[in-house]
């Protein structure tokens, strides 16, 4: 991990939030903690604060250096290693390397076979000891009182969910506004629901930055886990009008990581501008029900 050391004291929101991190004006609903990856051990309760609601998002700078990220982008562009490629709905102009559980269109047995191959390819993508599992998950653990972060186990011994997915967003690619907790209502989550708490959050590692757009935008609209169905149920007509909501949008550099209370807060990815693909790794996560670990999936 690289990058100069900075002090990351808990300050009043207006002091803690830097305009370089946000597109638009600071909004008081969003409490942001920013730190350098090398300072993670100074913030061992950061993710606990996020789960409790006193922090809404955490930006970790320089998890990877830009040179390595460019190499990873080159390999992803060449589809090397040959990850399973799946797609968002066509209008989103985006795709996955790996299988997004929310959009899973295969049977569980096939999914867990694909997950085994996916993890092999993921190991090949990064230099030894610098992969998502060995670097990012350990970083998250350091920000969560050293609680282990790992791929959620499958229903049978030796099975596990895909730890993450790599996402490519082409020109015009975007993701509509949603809260992640609503995903748990879908059939693919039936087994996972038996393992984890109802409140999930997520991390996004920016691997390749687009020419413009592709920002993660979070809205001043919060839905508790027990009310997630309100956004997932098409029969509910009183859904939020985004034009009436305050929001913040984050500008990250390649190698930066953001952790967001995406389970409760409405959020989206704004359309990508230009021909440079936006590449990320994205994992969802939630407390194991015994609270001794955090389980992750893509």
Q: At which residue positions do the language-model features occur?
A:
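Extracellular structured ligand-interaction cores
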Residues: 55-57, 161-163, 198-204, 213, ...
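Short, flexible loop/turn elements at secondary-structure junctions
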Residues: 62-64, 167-170, 181, 205-207, ...
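Catalytic core of Fe(II)/2-oxoglutarate
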Residues: 228-298
